[in-house]
From Swiss-Prot:
UniProt cross-references to PANTHER family, sorted A to Z: OS08G0260000 PROTEIN (PTHR47876), PHYTOCHROME 1 (PTHR47876:SF3)
Domain GAF: 267-449
Single GO biological process annotation from the record: red, far-red light phototransduction
Every Histidine kinase domain range: 923-1143
Descriptive protein name: Phytochrome B-2
NCBIfam families: sensory_box
Source organism (scientific name): Glycine max
Keywords attached to this entry: Chromophore, Photoreceptor protein, Phytochrome signaling pathway, Receptor, Repeat, Sensory transduction, Transcription, Transcription regulation
Start-end of Pro residues biased regions: 13-24
Length: 1149
């Protein structure tokens, strides 16, 4: 409502918001969980956020009415009492009146004047009472020969007659602009007095509002220089923000308050953050030493009205010059249906309660700036990323203070950069939190595998480490396992009874107030347990997390009561806000954040499976075949994306080439072949460093390769490449490249890919410019297509060069842009940029060049004169005179080809899919361990029972299969298989056990496909003991046999496994088994593409192909070999393997 932040600023948009329905005000946050929790999580969050906003609109309106009534009756307004939560409904008319009062109050601040104008006719529709005096126009002016005194000022007057001719031209030009705000400020002079003003324009529903702020100089050139100087200061502050170490939001906020105070000179500057429950907190502060600190102060949500927050996303800067000054009335045409909308005006007067609040805290002036970050993608409209008001940067001064518009504009740029930097930090923090939660979940899963479910509360880490809480508990099989601050066992049983009685159909519940959630025993728990999150594991087993009341977490350096503040709790003041906040959160905990609930829900799903396994430990676990289908689908998707990316790279108009780990070319597209004159077949295998680049680039390329092979990727590096063939005559080609580490799907670096941009033409221009300054104009304006688009600025960022290529690219002629400000006028009004963030980034690049810091290949996009989207890379270099002084900036554009954009997009998509599949693979490997543990446990139980020989054989076969699966899961190391460095674990084993395990793995598929299995296996081989890696042999043979079964004709077909052993005696006494395995089926057998995948070393196309390829390589490591043979009526795998026979078997032989 009234806030120390001065954020009374905003209100509703020009077309009033529909009055929200008057719901019951209920600020506790209680949510039920269901099985579809994750699917609708973001939608639920949005609905919850909207309902909270509607509730706050209603409460804002109620408080506004109480304040107004207290003024009329002469009673004091007791803020801390009025803000207490109430279920009182608010009439719709009262809400409408509140919104109208804030939006169309009819008064402005007296430090400037306001005129509203009908857009087509320039006719005055409304004006502030002080406009005449400020412009120097008096009603008593006596007509004279000097027409300067003939200006008439009244409703219906053409506003152009009030200003000089040049000012009228500027107004006409601004009125015709598509985005009028980008023209601000307009430098205009009163026709009568000659006084200069900043004209700040914005459109409303009935016309254009012009805020007139007196300027401090009469020379517009000095004004431009002052604006540029303000921008330079802002850019310096932005550079400081960008140079900060990552991962520290507090440091970022501390730095921005220092920068803003240095820029503006206010006595106090704060960063005010909005929490998820809409209340606010001062998280950073810099101030005059004698002022009371506000760091750590929390405000109730109603301190910043919802209407104000909404408009802060459109109107990002709000200044109050003097809260004690009398507001100036706005006079308007009677034909207007409703009072003039002032929400976008820089002059709008503060509301009475806000002025009173500022006066009570000893603040006279304020400047408030919005901090905007990206919201949830789901909230965006029309494909655009939504924006969220994260908080405010608030400036206070103990005396009247007015900041000129150029400096406010520079501060707004600083806020945009702060928002971008903050957004990155928050994303990194969220990712870090997610990793920590995943790590904790993994450790908890390992505990469940090694121990009973109670391990998650008896060992470290425990469930308390999963989310921030004061206590946690597990209720399992009627036993209570508490940790930290928790209810007693009797109380927890009572809570469970309440949950089952009122929330049985849900899978969980979270609340910040058990009392408001309806639990009747909440009072007996006291402040120690206010908030609770519970996850139902089974009908009788539960997980709990508990939080104490919020006030326990709140610390404020200024909260100490001063004896002289006798009315501290009643008057509107930061102390009463803090008291009101503590009243609001009484018996409440901090709310449970969405990320925390996601972590709880994930653990809930894991525990359900674990508890089921514990309950059914004697049953055999079966792996869900859908996992295999999911992997296959993912592989197919990746394969499709990979093929499309290869096609795009081959046909791209940008040079793209790749090398292996030895730096030799293994990829060379058509464009780089065209530039260098070197055909792809000749380029393959050449050394990039020794054969393809000039000597002066060898060291650069060598470093690029070395870093990229370590996973450290560099961007925008220029290399000088050789050319070949008689047409090129050993000329140089200059390419700016990005080095990308090429990784296989196990995330190991296997080479480097270079995506480049040919800058030979630009290099020629730059060299000629440096060496032959006299040829400057001839070079820049040469229509030769090799000359890139070029524009330049003076040291005030005004455009002074715009070459032929820029005219052709943008559709704007040189005459249209010369002399205009590059930021705002040229790029902004003429060539529209996408959003204020793009303008901020362009301004930073331009000012960096003016400061001597060049920028290479900055992504830059805009709309040309005809609305066509242009994407380019911007290179900005300083311009210097003969004495070496910087006098402006040179800018070059490199146009991005659609093919390259598409190729890069496909590459990013492939990397995204690869990462997703890697996560799925890691999840599957982790998930499979649990049922395998069950199988192992079942086998151990069966071993202790009386079994027949046949049953023992079945058990041995099951154990062999289980060990094979564990081996594959633990040793997912494809790189070592590829390069032949896989370590084999050899030992003695019976060959018959291996054959039994191999056959068992295809029996289900044989039955499903109605196939007959023919075994031609000599009896003596089953008892033969040999030496080797049993599990790898088992893996290889089962993979070959399984593929034969898959492609055998069905139904009523057959599959044969034939083993032919031969014993060979070696001279030194060693006995070798020479075993031939044939896996046979009739018909056409495996598809040729699959066999090609199996024997192809360069890659794989399908899941089966990868498996066969890996099996062939593992077999080769064991000195074996495999062939696939097609005969007239049948096909088969022919596997040869030699294994040493152990002494035990040698004696039998």
């Amino acid at each position: 409502m009234a806030s120390a932040s001065g954020a009374e600023n905003s209100s509703v948009p020009p077309s009033p918001l529909p009055p929200p329905p008057p719901p019951q005000i209920h600020t506790s946050r209680t949510k039920l969980s269901h099985h579809h929790h994750n699917n609708n999580n973001n939608n639920n969050n949005n609905i919850d956020s909207t309902s909270k906003a509607i509730a706050q609109y209603t409460e804002d309106a109620r408080l506004h009415a109480v304040f107004e009534q207290s003024g009329e009756s002469g009673r004091s307004f007791d803020y801390s009492q009025s803000i207490r939560v109430t279920s009182e409904s608010v009439p719709e008319q009262q809400i409408t009146a509140y919104l109208l009062k804030i939006q169309r109050g009819g008064f402005i601040q007296p430090f400037g004047s306001m005129i509203a104008v009908d857009e087509p006719s320039f006719r005055i529709l409304a004006y502030s009472d002080n406009a005449r005096d400020m412009l120097g126009i008096t009603p008593q002016s006596v007509p004279s020969l000097d027409d300067k005194n003939d200006a008439a000022f009244a409703l219906g007057t053409d506003i152009r007659t009030l200003f000089t001719h040049s000012s009228a031209v500027l107004l006409e030009k601004a009125f015709s602009a598509r985005e009028i705000s980008l023209m601000n400020p307009i430098w205009i002079h009163s026709r009568t007095s000659g006084k200069p003003f900043y004209g700040i324009l914005h459109r409303i529903d009935v016309g254009i509002v012009i805020d007139l702020e007196p300027a401090r100089t009469e020379d517009p050139a000095l004004s431009i220089a002052g604006a540029v100087q303000s921008q330079k200061l802002a850019v310096r502050a932005i550079s400081q923000l960008q140079s900060l170490p990552g991962g520290d939001v507090k440091l970022l906020c501390d730095t921005v308050v220092e920068s803003v105070r240095e820029l503006t000179g206010y006595d106090r500057v704060m960063v005010y953050r909005f929490h998820e429950d809409e209340h606010g907190e001062v998280v950073a502060e810099t101030k005059r030493p004698d002022l009371e600190p506000y760091i750590g102060l929390h405000y109730p949500a109603t301190d910043i009205p919802q209407a104000s927050r909404f408009l802060f996303k459109q109107n990002r800067v709000r200044m109050i010059v003097d809260c004690h000054a009398s507001a100036v009335r706005v006079v308007q045409d009677e034909a207007l249906v409703q009072p003039l909308c002032l929400v976008g005006s820089t002059l709008r007067a503060p509301h009475g309660c806000h002025a009173q609040y500022m006066a009570n805290m000893g603040s006279t002036a304020s400047l408030v700036m919005a901090v905007i970050i990206n919201g949830n993608d789901e909230e965006g409209v029309g494909g655009r990323t939504s924006m969220r008001l994260w908080g405010l940067v608030v400036c206070h001064h103990t005396s009247a203070r007015c900041i000129p518009f150029p400096l406010r504009y520079a501060c707004e740029f600083l806020m945009q950069a702060f928002g971008l930097q903050l957004n990155m930090e928050l994303q990194l923090a969220a990712q870090s939190l997610e990793k920590r939660v995943l790590r904790t979940q993994t450790l908890l899963c390992d505990m469940l595998l090694r121990d009973s479910p109670t391990g998650i509360v008896t060992q470290s880490p425990s469930i308390m480490d999963l989310v921030k809480c004061d206590g946690a508990a597990l209720y399992y099989q009627g036993n209570y396992y508490p940790l930290g601050v928790t209810p007693t066992e009797a109380q927890i049983r009572d809570i469970i009874e309440w949950l089952l009685a009122f929330h049985r159909d849900s899978t969980g519940l979270s609340t910040d107030s058990l009392a408001d959630a309806g639990y009747p025993g909440a009072a007996s728990l006291g402040d120690a347990v206010c908030g609770m999150a519970v996850a139902y594991i089974t009908e009788k087993d539960f997980l709990f997390w508990f939080r104490s009341h919020t006030a326990k977490e709140i610390k404020w350096g200024g909260a100490k009561h001063h004896p002289e503040d006798k009315d501290d709790g009643q008057r509107m003041h930061p102390r009463s806000s803090f008291k009101a906040f503590l009243e609001v959160v009484k018996s409440r905990s901090l709310p449970w954040e969405n990320a925390e609930m996601d972590a709880i829900h994930s653990l809930q799903l894991i525990l359900r499976d674990s508890f089921k396994d514990a309950e059914h430990s004697n049953s055999k676990a079966v792996l869900d075949p859908r996992m295999s289908e999911l992997e296959l689908q993912g592989v197919d998707e990746l394969s499709s994306v990979a093929r499309e990316m290869v096609r795009l790279i081959e046909t791209a108009t940008a040079p793209i080439f790749a090398v292996d780990v030895d730096g030799r070319i293994n990829g060379w597209n058509a464009k780089v072949s065209e530039l260098t004159g070197l055909p792809v077949e000749e380029a393959m295998g050449k050394s990039l460093v020794r054969d393809l680049v000039f000597k002066e680039s060898e060291e650069t390329v060598d470093k690029l390769l070395s870093r990229a092979l370590k996973g450290e990727e560099d961007k925008n590096v220029e290399i000088k490449m050789r050319t070949f063939g008689p047409e090129h005559q050993n000329k140089a080609v200059f390419v700016v490249v990005n080095a990308c580490s090429s990784k296989d799907y196990t995330n190991n670096v296997v080479g480097v890919c270079f995506v480049g941009q040919d800058v030979t033409g630009q290099k020629i221009v730059m060299d000629k410019f440096i060496n032959i300054q006299g040829d400057y104009k001839a070079i820049v304006h040469n229509p030769n297509p090799l000359i890139p688009p070029i524009f330049a600025s003076d040291d005030n960022t005004c455009c002074l060069e715009w070459n032929t290529a820029m005219e052709k690219l943008t559709g704007w002629s040189r005459a249209d842009v010369i002399g205009k400000m590059l930021v705002g006028e040229v790029f902004g009004s003429c060539c529209q940029l996408k959003g204020s963030d793009s303008i901020t980034k362009f301004m930073i690049v331009l000012h960096n060049a003016l400061g001597g810091h060049d920028t290479d290949r900055f992504p830059f996009s805009f709309l040309d004169r005809y609305g066509k989207h242009v994407q380019a890379f911007l290179t900005a270099n300083k311009r210097v005179n003969m004495d070496g002084q910087i006098i402006g900036a040179f800018c070059f554009l490199q146009i991005v080809s659609p093919e390259l954009q598409q190729a890069l997009k496909a590459q990013r998509q492939q990397e995204k899919n690869s990462f997703a599949r890697m996560k799925e693979l890691a999840y599957i490997c982790q998930g499979v361990k649990n049922p395998l543990s069950g199988i192992r446990f079942t086998n151990s139980l069966l071993e202790a029972t009386c079994l027949s020989n046949e049953q023992k054989q079945f058990l041995e076969t099951s154990a062999a299969c289980e060990k094979q699966m564990l081996k594959i899961i633990h040793d997912v190391d494809i790189e070592s298989i590829e390069d032949g460095s896989l370590e084999l674990e050899k030992g003695e084993f019976l060959l018959g056990n291996v054959i039994n395990a191999v056959v068992s793995q295809v029996m289900l598929l044989l039955r499903e496909r109605n196939l007959q299995l023919i075994r031609d296996i000599p009896e003596e081989i089953k008892t033969l003991a040999v030496y080797g890696d049993q599990l790898r042999i088992q893996q290889v043979l089962s993979d070959f046999l399984l593929n034969i079964v898959r492609y055998a004709p069905s139904p009523d077909g057959w599959v044969e496994i034939h083993v032919h052993p031969r014993i060979k005696q070696i001279s030194d006494g060693l006995t070798l088994l020479h075993a031939e395995f044939r896996m046979v089926c009739p018909g056409e057998g495996l598809p040729p593409e699959l066999i090609q995948n199996m024997f192809n070393n360069s890659g794989w196309g399908t899941q089966e192909g990868l498996g066969l390829s890996m099996s062939r390589k593992i077999l080769k490591l064991m000195n074996g070999e495999v062939q696939y043979i097609r005969e007239a009526q049948r096909c088969y795998f022919y596997v040869l393997l030699e294994l040493p026979v152990t002494r035990r078997s040698s004696k039998k032989c």
